Amino acid sequence: MAEEEVGNSQRQSEEIEAMAAIYGEEWCVIDENAKIFCIRVTDFMDDPKWTLCLQVMLPSEYPGTAPPSYQLNAPWLKGQERADLSNSLEEIYVHNMGESILYQWVEKIRDALIQKSQITEPDPDVKKKTEEVEVESEEDPILEHPPENPVKTLDLKISEETQPETEELPPVAHGVPITDRRSTFQAHVAPVVCPEQVKLVLAKLYENKKIASATHNIYAYRIFCEDKQTFLQDCEDDGETAAGGRLLHLMEILNVKNVMVVVSRWYGGILLGPDRFKHINNCARNILVEKNFTNTPDESTKNLGKKKVKKDKKKNDH
C-alpha cells in the first residue's frame, strides 16, 4: 500500500471514530469493509419536521485526492432542491480539498433542514420513491408474472402510541446480506398469525438504526385464516416500485403461510436495473428455506397463540 493510501486510511479511521462519538446511534455502519456509512439528519426539533439520510462511501483516495461518494435519501427531496443541496456539499469539498469533510456535510444538511422547517410544512402524503427506473427482466419467471390483482397496503404507522400491547412479538431472524455494486440487500423473517404482529415486527425492526435508515424496506406477509380457509395477505414497496408485489408473488409460489418477510435495501449509488428484484427475491427465498417456512410452515406458529383474524379491507386469496 502506498504511503499516501496509508495516510488516508488512518485519517478515515480517525474521522469515522469522531463521527461515531459526535452523533452516537445516528451514525450507522452499512459495510465496514467497503467503508459505507449512513447518518440520519434531522432539523434538531423535538418532533422533527424534516429528516434526511446521508449515505457515504469513502474511497481509498479520500480525503487526500478524492471526495466521498454520497447518496441523499429523502422522500421529499427532488428537483431543484436536491440539486441545490448536492451543489452545497460539492462546494464544501472544493473549498476543503484534502481535508476531512463529513462533519461539515452533515451540519450543512442540518442547516438546510432547519431553514426548510421554518418556511414549509411536510406533505403527509409524500412517499419514498425509488432511485431507479422500472425495468422488466426477461430472465426470471417470477419477475415476469407479478400478482394479477395488486393488494392494498396496511397503514402501519410505527409509533409507541399505535403499537398493540395484547399480541406477543414473534421472534425475528436476519438473513445473510447480499452486496452488488455497492447496494446491499438483507432479508428478515418472522412468523405471524395476525396483522397486529406484522406491526410489532416492523416496529421492532425500525428500532435498529441501520434498518431504519435503509433506502427501502420492502415487505410482504401471508396469514392463513383457518375459520374461513382463506389467506390474508399484503405487501409494501416502500418506494421500490413493484418490489412488494413481486415478493408476495414469490411467497405464493413457495406456498408459505403465517410468515412475513422484510427485505432491506441500502442503495449504493449505482443503478442495478432488474437485478435488484432478483436480489430482493433471492434474499427472501434463502431465509424462508433456511428457517424451514417452505417445508413446515405450521411449526413456527404453534406457540404464538392463534386468534381469529378479520378481513379488515385486505385481499383474501383462495
From Swiss-Prot:
Keyword Phosphoprotein listed:
yes
Q: In which tissues is it expressed?
A: Present in neurons in most areas of the brain. Present at high level in hypothalamus, particularly in the suprachiasmatic nucleus (at protein level). Preferentially expressed in brain, with a weaker expression in other tissues.
Q: Which SMART domains match?
A: RWD
- Where is composition skewed (Basic residues) in this entry? 304-318
Kindly list the residue ranges recorded as spanning the membrane: none
Q: Which GO terms describe its cellular component?
A: cytoplasm; cytosol
One GO biological process this protein is involved in is: negative regulation of transcription by RNA polymerase II
A single Pfam family, by name?
UPF0029
Compartments reported by the entry: Cytoplasm
> Major location, coarse class?
cytoplasm
Checking InterPro entries in the record gives: Impact, Impact_N, Impact_N_sf, Ribosomal_Su5_D2-typ_SF, RWD_dom, UBQ-conjugating_enzyme/RWD, UPF0029_Impact_CS
- A GO term for molecular function: actin binding
The UniProt entry's sequence similarity note says:
Belongs to the IMPACT family.
Q: What is this protein called?
A: Protein IMPACT
Q: Which organism is it from?
A: Mus musculus (Mouse)
Which gene is this protein's source? Impact
